[in-house]
Amino acid sequence: MRLITLFLILASLPLHAQKAPKTKALIKLTPIEVATEDRVYKRTPQGELKLHFFKPKGGLQIAVQRPCVVFFFGGGWKSGSYLQFVPQAEYLASRGIIAACADYRISSIHKTTPDKAVEDAKSAIRWVRGHADEIGVDPTKIIAAGGSAGGHLAACTALVTAYDAESDDKNISAKPNALVLFNPAMNIATLFRERAAEQNPVKMDVAEAITPNNFVTKDTPPAILFFGTADQLKIGGDEFVQKARALGLRAEMWAAPEMPHGFFNKAPWMQVTARQMDVFLTSLNYLGGEPTIRLPEGAPSLIAE
């Protein structure tokens, strides 16, 4: 019963925290203006998919290869928009990282299933790495990031070896070099197994094949995860961290006391989690100096687990 409730929480996200606004995000994490650019990274039978780039102001200096982060929005693989992670993308661009918010196929618009979204996420990472020289990206410093269903997709780019699009150049790796995951869905096979088969968007063999926790290996990149302690999806996050640490890997878990799923979408937790993301990326030498983000007065603290 607990797992059924968990799935219902995930599936309902388009109506609540994970539904991105249809207008520009109101929260600004930096006063610094950044450059923007849209690039089509994939053409599918259901339409074009874009990467919405946010770059350090003044244009790219191609001689300088910068880290790049690709954000995937949440929405239960049903709905959502790249706009969800615009605040974080703008902030990281202001700090010198090239950031991109990715489109991917969702059921409400494209009538597709989660495995197609996995294909799209891997295609997005491959596009960035394959065009690294053109867009000024260091191909050894690519970060996959996302929230909820988007966190699941980001994790899949690092862990899932199946579900590569036929149009992809398989000689280009889709594996990112680091993960930033906001309450990701890491154990979807367990969730789907507790439901009636006709209620699941994919069959169980597909669910197993796109469950990140099934594929944690010594090659898993360093990861940081954010969860509210009241979020039942945290069970899967804890499982991932346990598996990664057992292999001697770096996997950080930061918990927001008594907070529900999607807590990071609103102030003050958006600022708090973004600052910790900055600290993590600085520790990997993807950023330099101190975080420039200002925390609201009396902002709460995350707990390291």
Locations of regions flagged by a protein language model:
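N-terminal cap/lid segment of alpha/beta-hydrolase-fold proteins
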Residues: K19-V64, T217
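C-terminal catalytic histidine-bearing segment of alpha/beta-hydrolase fold enzymes
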Residues: H52, F226, Q232, D238-E305
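Short beta-strand element of the alpha/beta-hydrolase
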Residues: A63-G75
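A fold-wide structural signal in alpha/beta-hydrolase
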Residues: C68, Y91-D103, I143, A178, ...
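The conserved beta1-alpha1 loop
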Residues: F72-G74, V128, F227-G228
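Catalytic nucleophile-loop/oxyanion-hole region of alpha/beta-hydrolase
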Residues: S81-Y82, Q88, A102-P139, K266-T273
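Primarily recognizes the serine-hydrolase "nucleophile elbow" in alpha/beta-hydrolase
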Residues: L83, S123-A197, K203, A207-E208, ...
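Short beta-strand/loop motif that positions the catalytic acidic residue
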Residues: D219, I224-G228
